[in-house]
A protein has these predicted regions:
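Charged, terminal alpha-helix-loop-beta segments
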Residues: 143-144, 155-173, 177-183, 247, ...
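A non-catalytic, helix-rich entry segment at domain boundaries
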Residues: 103-180
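Mg2+/Mn2+-dependent nuclease catalytic core
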Residues: 178-272
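Hydrophobic (often cysteine-bearing) scaffold residues that line and stabilize catalytic clefts
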Residues: 96, 100, 104, 152, ...
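Short, compositionally biased low-complexity segments
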Residues: 73-84, 117-140, 241-251
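C-terminal, charged and often intrinsically disordered regions of DNA end-processing helicases
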Residues: 1-99
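Metal-dependent nuclease catalytic regions and adjoining charged, substrate-binding loops involved
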Residues: 1-15, 21-23, 33-35, 220, ...
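A residue-level signal for conserved active-site and pocket-lining positions in enzyme catalytic cores
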Residues: 78, 104-108, 199, 231, ...
Length: 318
């Protein structure tokens, strides 16, 4: 097993261990974050959540107030749209390029998991159908049915190949975990912040430093880095040990990696505290602000919202 202070190198074909090696070589070892500093961050987040809950009345039926990772991104776009999404209002049906963008993101998560647990995906489209059927993901299967077979194969085959080239032969010493949950319970259980981490490598039980990895099928966007920082925060508070780095991987590109310093942790905590306060207010009944953008195209409120954007600007889903 590689030493924790050395880049791990496995005997791997193609790029294999090179993917992790490239991340690792770009992450300068940060000053370790003391457990007491993590405890302090948790206490500050808890105090902020308690304060937010004390300023408003939240009905018992709306407890606990849930703040998943997706809520941060939704609120950064539009409060009214975030409420519509959270209350399980069916969004507008996505078609064409938008549907393919969503499918790429769904497929990427499944393909990376398959690569790390069972090996290479050989036939992308049949494999994805099988994976979605196995977990009874009818919504994604319906989305898949909305595009032609040729469109789906053209979009998915290169994705599966890129996953195999980049993730094949990963040193098992890293003990990769996919789609793992990290939750933070605040204000005596009244607020729950959570996220699902795409890939975790290393960590307390492995003898290796921890690395948190987000995989993204679309183009790099500023909010992606903030999402990765949030995951690093949640994992640190879950495990009591901070990962040393976060990375974002986009198929066909070199990974973007950042060491996890205390400053990174504090910035993520401040953003989470602000978002929690905003969401608590909205759940309690505050009128949401409206911020039009390309997301109006799939917002269920667009027919009723006076601020809804009506042009035909499109955006691929990350």
């Amino acid at each position: 097993m590689p030493a924790p202070d050395d880049p791990p190198h496995g005997d791997a074909p193609s790029q294999s261990g090179q993917l992790v090696d490239r991340w690792w070589s770009r992450i300068a070892a940060p000053t370790p974050i003391a457990p007491a500093e993590l405890v302090e961050l948790r206490e500050e987040l808890d105090a902020a959540a308690v304060a937010a809950m004390s300023r408003v009345h939240v009905d018992a039926d709306d407890l606990p107030v849930r703040v998943p990772k997706s809520r941060l991104a939704d609120l950064a776009r539009c409060e009214r749209s975030a409420l519509a999404s959270a209350w399980s209002v069916d969004p507008r049906r996505r078609e064409g390029a938008e549907a393919l963008g969503l499918l790429r993101g769904i497929a990427l998560d499944h393909f990376v998991t398959h690569q790390l647990t069972e090996g290479r995906v050989l036939e992308a489209l049949p494999a994805l159908v099988s994976m979605l059927t196995a977990v009874a993901d009818d919504e994604s299967l319906e989305l898949l049915d909305s595009v032609s077979i040729d469109e789906a194969e053209t979009a998915l085959a290169p994705l599966a190949a890129s996953v195999a080239d980049s993730w094949g032969g990963l040193d098992p010493a890293w003990m990769p975990r996919t789609q793992s949950r990290a939750s933070l319970v605040l204000a005596g259980g009244a607020v729950i912040c959570s996220g699902v981490v795409d890939v975790e490598l290393g960590g307390p039980t492995t003898g290796l430093p921890g690395v948190v990895i987000e995989v993204k099928s679309g183009r790099p966007a500023p909010e992606h880095q903030a999402e990765a920082y949030l995951y690093a925060l949640l994992v640190a508070l879950r495990d009591g040990v901070a990962p040393v780095g976060v990375a974002r991987w986009y198929p066909g590109s070199d990974p973007a990696s950042t060491p996890v310093t205390l400053g990174v942790r504090e910035a993520a905590a401040a953003r989470l505290a602000d978002t929690t306060a905003t969401w608590v207010e909205l759940v309690a009944g505050r009128t949401p602000e409206e911020s039009p953008g390309v997301w109006c195209r799939w917002c269920a409120e667009s027919d009723r919202c006076p601020s809804a954007r009506t042009d035909d600007v499109r955006e691929s889903h990350p």
